[in-house]
Regions:
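Signature of N-terminal electron-transfer/Fe-S-associated modules in redox systems
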Residues: 1-134
């Protein structure tokens, strides 16, 4: 599938950010969302452009590092999944996908789609926890 991407680019928390348009081509429906971003970044690097910065760690739906807003929804169109569990089969050929970082004062942008999660980490280090009804 061929997709248009509108990705939030921002140098740091104090810089003015903006959406930048990209295209990716021949993406398999079985590709994960983060793999699609990897494909875009490989293309950008080949063209001597700066890759899009985004967080990820386990890529197994465990750690929560990959949190993004996709088309205005946390983690994308599905519910009860993380961004790394989202696959491109949830989109249609020719779709435009808008990708943004979390918009929260507690999580300022480090760069592009990566945010500073230290406020959350401090809660965990202090012995606190965050619970979610499941």
């Amino acid at each position: 599938m061929n997709l248009k991407l509108k990705i939030w680019r921002q140098q740091n928390a104090h810089a003015q950010g903006k959406f930048v348009d990209y295209t990716v081509e021949n993406i398999s429906p079985d590709t994960s969302f983060l793999e699609m971003l990897d494909i875009l970044n490989n293309k950008l690097i080949q063209n001597n452009e700066e890759p899009v910065v985004f967080d990820h760690d386990c890529r197994e739906g465990i750690c929560g590092m990959c949190s993004l807003h996709i088309n205005g929804h946390a983690h994308g169109p599905d519910t009860d999944i993380t961004t790394c569990q989202l696959h491109m089969r949830k989109f249609k050929d020719g779709d435009t996908i808008t990708i943004e970082p979390w918009r929260s004062r507690a999580f300022p942008v480090i760069k592009d789609l990566a945010v500073d999660r230290s406020a959350y980490d401090k809660i965990l280090q202090a012995g606190g926890f965050i619970s979610v009804n499941t």
